[in-house]
Amino acid sequence: MFSFGTVFTFALLLIPLTEAVDSSYVAAVYEHNLILNPDPRVPLSRLEALQHLQKNLDIFEVQAARAAQQGAQIIVFPEDGLHGFNFSRTSISAYLETVPDPEQESWNPCLEPLRHNNTEVLQQLSCMARRNNLYLVANMADLQPCSVSAAPSSCPPDGRWQFNTNVVFRSDGLLVARYHKYNLYFEAAFDAPPEPEIVTFDTPFAGKFGLITCFDILFQEPTVILVEKGVRQIIFPAAWMNQLPLLDIIQFQRAFSLGANVTLLAANIRNDQLIMTGSGIYTPFSATYHHAQRGDPEEGRLLVARVPVLDPEWLGHNAASGEAAAVDESSGYCYSETCLDSPASTAPVFVSSMMYDPFTFALLNATDGEMRVCNGTFCCYLQYRWVTETGRTELYALGAFDGTHTVNGRYAVQVCALVRCAGSDASSCGQEVDEAESKLDFMLEGKFASRHVYPSVLSSGMVLEQPERVEAAADGRVSLKHSNVMGGLVTACLYGRMHHLDTA
């Protein structure tokens, strides 16, 4: 059995998403068991805040040095990794530093520490990058003064913006990028910037990278905008609370990398109480990732991997467009236009809540077969075959949902999911499960109203599986084929984001 605490690495040959790449670089991400402020609602003095920040900075220093020793050229630390969470707007005040805009001002905090007051964290991060000769990405709390009296003004009443902010330092310590998180997730201490920021930075070893933070990954701005602008390498600090069966962070990190055809450097917090774990270095053809097991020591984890450069400008040619692979007509699976027009499942359908959304489900009752389940006019199609009989006591269902998710965020989705149910009753379908014994070969297909569809296969023990085949057609049909599953199947999913249907 696989352990959650294991670092997994796999390389794969997916559908031909890009041309072969003969250039590479070494990336590192650090999953940080951060030292928290025990009472974040109580305001501190600047000295007290610095004493707390220093405890986490000292850990960052050790990990940056370890990464550099392994040849890393860039390291990513997680969201909230220095200060923590659950502050009020007032109580975070002592943690704030004003981060200058690198597009307006060239500043190396390590070499010019006296240029700006109250920038101790910026100075230490700058020197950390410089000492270890690597690019460094960290997340911190930023204060930007603004004018309340200006008309019109979106400035907060206290005359300052407080931003959840990613900062990037060049290998010589120069501050080269600043990104203010746009899609906040219950963050009372911070403001969303008035407009979404599309922020990139260039490196001499891999070209261009784009910056997003945690909840941003689910939204059009800035994430999809970056990808549509041709940014193929994304930095992703996160403090992500996992939720099965569809949005465990490693599951969606991998799905996003595949669906968007990008490299994702993802660093998460490790906090067992908040169900936070899961970091990785993902490309369209490889993944190195870590997911802790319940009961594992609550500690940090450094991941280092060599990955191909994907920036087409750096490579000097255009990357492939991501067209679907040729259909394998001998596969035994249906890829014709009639797949989704197949007769509806003879199994009765039922509604059960999954991720707080009312999915329409049908049970897999046969050893093999095909079925179609619809939620409104959105339909999901499945062909399946049980490979082993040992897991036939486990219940599986095909689920479909087309609508707006409204709990802990509001966004429109279309989802096709093959899930193992938590128990032997249909009402358990959609509940959280992380173990399974059943092995199935399958092809899952849906016709989506968006190009932004993210495929994933998750097997027992929080192990990611490489989909054998993913195809996307011009008419919105997306299919996910997988066989020879390594472990019991927990979830297979096509997660579509309907950005054009999002409402405030």
UniProtKB/Swiss-Prot annotation:
Q: Does the keyword Secreted apply?
A: yes
Q: What class of enzyme is it?
A: hydrolase
The entry sums up its family as follows: Belongs to the carbon-nitrogen hydrolase superfamily. BTD/VNN family.
Signal peptide interval: 1-20
Q: Name one GO cellular component term.
A: extracellular region
InterPro entries, from UniProt?
Answer: Biotinidase-like_euk (IPR012101), Biotinidase/VNN (IPR040154), C-N_Hydrolase (IPR003010), C-N_Hydrolase_sf (IPR036526), Vanin_C (IPR043957)
Species the sequence originates in: Takifugu rubripes (Japanese pufferfish)
Gene name, Swiss-Prot/TrEMBL: btd
Q: What is this protein called?
A: Biotinidase
Instruction: Please name the SUPFAM superfamilies in this protein's record.
Output: Carbon-nitrogen hydrolase
One Pfam family of this protein, by short name?
Vanin_C
